[in-house]
């Protein structure tokens, strides 16, 4: 086999680096001649409804495409992957609708195209995505439906189950579109841009969840785009080039060289350095964390689309665009499919030949050559392809009758046919027959097993048991130290193929939770995009004492082993709890604890969603239900008969191994017993303070979503459901305690940015007057303290626990047991007593003359604690109360008053003392 002559690599450094850059106006070439068909298709005929129905009926019953092209009923991908090609249009004969309805299958080991089936409707310039043994066909033009000679874009979604060869119509997209593109990531399918039937270029982005058959609208592309290349790399989706609109002259369009990056977890867009020249109707794949851009089109001197033959490699980290090699024939509007180290380039349009092309080429990354493969049965452009992986491991393929591109001259002695198929053809035929028999036998056994379980009754229970056994086995594999091999070495490990478990764990769980699940509502706040750098937290400022800084590798690994998007399990302590019927007691105030993280098991996000209820007279914790999303180091407040949860870390979102702060606001209404997502804060926050003052909710300070400490303050308007910026603190800080007392908002201690070698722990006190909107200094604390908690009890401010810097040179945080009180007469902070367990990042709640201290981190034990304590203010005693079900830190708690006040505060304190006193 001849080798492709490897050309010299020419590296063009794009301005900038791997950092995100601000938007800048880039010179683009305006033109109104951006038809990807190069104007060859002048007009399409309009069909009557009867003609459309007859055409669809003939195609549905079709058993062959044309003489000489064999049809197959099975993919036959037991040992090697195959490529499916869907639809497209032949520019020479655009009214042959069978071309746009056909599905062809390509077997690389045989180098042969076969007719497979037909689609439910003809499509061209559509997009496909493969997920969980199903191929989804999204949108595209329907040649059967034309208006004024133009094909109409569609919003349909068709699903092909490749094993059974059955089509099914799924939920439509929100927008009809063609010339769009899709990518599959994290069990979701994302659709970007496109063009509608009116010729308008779209910026809309939608996300499809196959298991739920549901579409969600996401943040739009900063500019309308069609004909862009799409690829995902390390959790970020790249939208490369395309055709955009001119804002001043909407009917005209531009070729764009911009690269937009979309972060699905945060629903945000960023910019990367641009391409060296405008490019549209290209294709992109990801290999070795680099993005390969295949062909495309730019503008000629006459202002017409001109196909290009360049294959370039974009390195997102270095910001370089490296020319790798060239196609023999320049092309655009082609389709690509990647299987392992091979990339197949199918069909497309060529301005050189001024027509659609039937070429199929394969790029072999290991040998760095491009090989010609068998031609498509018909020349097609606007085609979409999907790579179907092999069902079982087997010897990887080699294109048998490959002809290298003309730029790669054949070497003497090269053979056009693979040795595997030239030697012993009888053995090959026997192997093919044996594979078919074995495949049908496995299907028969599987069907028989399912029927047997259904006949036994309670099939759901047995299925759940089987699923639990599989998950337990994978967890044991993970704990035993297994690490996945690289993809090309791990293909044969069928036992470790990720499993897809939809809706696991079931929500709501087996406990009768009164909480209702909330769908994530994507908001599109107006934010200026630009460079963002994540600032990791120093060890001297980490409340978790560095125990979670290096968990990202294991976290991602366990998700891969389990095959789950979220590693979550039902808490083991659920069986010990009786489900609470209501969150509010009739006569006694109760304490509600939300979220948190177990430092021993940070990957279990069920802990971060849990809500506990503590009844003081029963001295008992009860499991109440789940929050909509897991949170830790968030803030909570009781406001207008509802529980408000703001900000906090989301364990599912990590950057550089650290959890990322959020800006969400979740509200639980006591009357309706429902969770609702309200308006997001203007700034993402964790380790912040949330309190109510003069019937206004305030969020103060914290750490934002790029790791910086913030000084901003926000207030929430309940009527307009919006957050408003207040006067900022004099300096940024996080981990401070906050109370409302004496007409001021008091901020006690906390951490500030590390600008010197001095420890960042603060001892100062700030007081904010919301009426006159100014900050004043209060009396400093007795010692510098961070991650403490404060409460007002008996009309005094009490500061409980916290962390102070160590006395050695490292200045690491050390938990302190002190309980300090502010004496307003002497204006001094005095230590009143000490806790039995030093702790910081705990929850402190005042209940009449009682202070409850629960959870937190104990630096002396280097772990979170489940021990809880009660400080009786009236008699200055500390009692031990019922422990938390698990050691948690980063919780947030509120006190829920009773429905009707029955006891006086003195009586309630006496009853509590009688309950907890031995």
UniProtKB/Swiss-Prot annotation:
Start and end residues of each IQ domain? 430-459
Keywords from the UniProt entry = Kelch repeat, Repeat
Q: Does the keyword Lyase apply?
A: no
**Which segments carry the region annotation Disordered?**
398-427
Q: Which SUPFAM superfamilies match?
A: Kelch motif
Kelch repeat start and end residues = 82-133, 134-187, 188-235, 237-289, 291-341, 342-390, 590-641, 642-695, 696-743, 745-795, 797-849, 851-898
**What does the record give as the function of this protein?**
Actin bundling protein found in the acrosomal sperm process.
Name the UniProt record assigns to this protein: Alpha-scruin
Q: Which organism does this sequence originate in?
A: Limulus polyphemus
């Amino acid at each position: 086999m001849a080798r492709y002559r490897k050309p010299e690599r020419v590296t063009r450094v794009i301005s900038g680096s791997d950092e995100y850059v601000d938007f800048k106006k880039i010179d683009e070439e305006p033109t109104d001649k951006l038809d990807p068909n190069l104007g060859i298709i002048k007009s399409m005929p309009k069909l009557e409804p009867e003609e459309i129905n007859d055409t669809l009926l003939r195609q549905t019953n079709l058993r062959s495409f044309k003489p000489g092209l064999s049809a197959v009923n099975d993919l036959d991908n037991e040992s090697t992957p195959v490529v499916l090609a869907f639809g497209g249009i032949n520019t020479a004969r655009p009214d042959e609708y069978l071309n746009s309805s056909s599905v062809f299958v390509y077997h690389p080991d045989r180098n042969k195209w076969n007719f497979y089936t037909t689609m439910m409707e003809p499509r061209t310039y559509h997009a496909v995505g493969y997920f969980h043994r199903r191929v989804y066909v999204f949108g595209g033009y329907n040649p059967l439906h034309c208006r004024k000679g133009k094909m109409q874009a569609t919003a349909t979604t068709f699903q092909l189950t490749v094993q059974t060869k059955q089509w099914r119509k799924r939920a439509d997209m929100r927008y009809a579109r063609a010339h769009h593109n899709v990518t599959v990531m994290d069990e979701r399918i994302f659709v970007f841009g496109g063009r509608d039937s009116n010729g308008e270029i779209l910026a809309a982005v939608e996300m499809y969840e196959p298991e739920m058959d549901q579409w969600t609208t996401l943040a739009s592309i900063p500019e309308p785009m069609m004909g862009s290349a799409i690829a995902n790399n390390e959790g970020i989706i790249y939208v490369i080039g395309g055709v955009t609109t001119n804002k001043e002259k909407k009917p005209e369009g531009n070729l764009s060289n911009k690269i937009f990056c979309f972060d699905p977890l945060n629903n945000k867009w960023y910019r990367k350095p641009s391409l060296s020249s405008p490019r549209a109707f290209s294709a992109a794949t990801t290999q070795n964390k680099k993005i390969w851009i295949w062909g495309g089109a730019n503008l000629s001197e006459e202002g017409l689309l001109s196909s290009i033959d360049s294959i370039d490699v974009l390195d997102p980290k270095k910001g370089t665009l490296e020319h790798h090699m060239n196609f023999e024939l320049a092309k655009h509007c082609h389709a690509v499919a990647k299987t392992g180290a091979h990339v197949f380039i199918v069909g497309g349009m060529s301005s050189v030949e001024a027509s659609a092309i039937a070429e199929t080429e394969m790029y072999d990354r290991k040998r760095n050559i491009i090989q010609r493969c068998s031609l498509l049965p018909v020349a097609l452009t606007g085609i979409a392809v999907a790579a179907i992986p092999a069902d079982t491991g087997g010897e990887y393929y080699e294109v048998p009758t490959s002809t290298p591109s003309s730029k790669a001259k054949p070497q003497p002695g090269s053979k056009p046919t693979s040795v595997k198929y030239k030697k012993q053809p009888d053995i090959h035929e026997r192997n093919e027959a044996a594979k078919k028999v074995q495949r049908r036998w496995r299907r028969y056994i599987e069907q028989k097993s399912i029927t047997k379980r259904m006949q036994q009754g309670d099939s759901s229970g047995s299925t759940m048991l089987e699923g639990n056994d599989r998950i337990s086995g994978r967890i044991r594999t993970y704990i035993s130290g297994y690490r996945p091999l690289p993809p090309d070495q791990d293909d044969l490990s069928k036992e470790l193929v990720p499993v897809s478990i939809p809706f696991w764990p079931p929500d709501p769980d087996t406990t009768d939770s009164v909480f209702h699940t909330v769908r994530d509502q994507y908001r599109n706040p107006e934010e200026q995009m630009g460079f963002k750098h994540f600032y990791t937290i120093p060890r001297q400022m980490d409340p978790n004492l560095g125990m979670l800084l290096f968990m990202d590798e294991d976290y991602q690994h366990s998700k891969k082993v389990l095959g789950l998007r979220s590693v979550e399990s039902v808490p083991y302590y659920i069986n010990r709890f009786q489900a609470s019927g209501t969150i509010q007691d009739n006569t006694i105030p109760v304490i509600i604890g939300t979220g948190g993280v177990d430092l021993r098991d940070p990957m279990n996000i069920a802990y971060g969603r849990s809500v506990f209820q503590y009844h003081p007279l029963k001295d008992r914790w009860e499991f109440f239900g789940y929050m909509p999303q897991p949170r830790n180091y968030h803030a909570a407040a009781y406001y207008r008969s509802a529980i408000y949860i703001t900000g906090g870390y989301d364990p599912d979102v990590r950057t550089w191994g650290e959890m990322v702060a959020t800006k969400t606001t979740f509200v639980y209404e006591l009357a309706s017993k429902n969770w609702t997502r309200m308006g997001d804060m203007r700034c993402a926050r964790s380790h912040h303070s949330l309190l109510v003052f003069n019937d206004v909710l305030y969020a103060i300070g914290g750490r934002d979503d790029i790791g910086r400490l913030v000084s901003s303050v926000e207030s929430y308007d309940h009527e307009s459901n919006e957050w408003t910026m207040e006067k900022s603190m004099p300096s940024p800080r996080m981990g401070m305690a906050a109370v409302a007392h004496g007409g001021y908002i008091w901020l006690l201690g906390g951490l500030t940015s590390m600008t010197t070698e001095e420890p960042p722990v603060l001892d100062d006190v700030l007081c904010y007057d919301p009426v006159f909107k100014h900050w004043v200094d209060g009396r400093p604390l007795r010692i510098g303290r961070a991650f403490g908690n404060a409460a007002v009890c008996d009309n005094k401010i009490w500061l409980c626990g916290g962390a102070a810097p160590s006395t050695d040179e490292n200045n690491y945080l050390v938990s302190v047991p002190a309980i300090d009180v502010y004496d307003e007469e002497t204006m001094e902070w005095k230590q009143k007593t000490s806790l039995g367990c030093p702790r910081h990042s705990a929850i402190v709640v005042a209940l009449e003359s009682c202070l409850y201290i629960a959870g937190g981190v104990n630096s002396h034990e280097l772990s979170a604690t489940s021990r809880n304590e009660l400080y009786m203010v009236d008699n200055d005693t500390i009692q031990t109360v019922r422990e938390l079900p698990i050691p948690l830190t980063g919780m947030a708690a509120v006190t829920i008053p009773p429905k009707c006040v029955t006891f006086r505060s003195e009586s309630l304190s006496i009853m509590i003392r009688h309950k907890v006193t031995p």
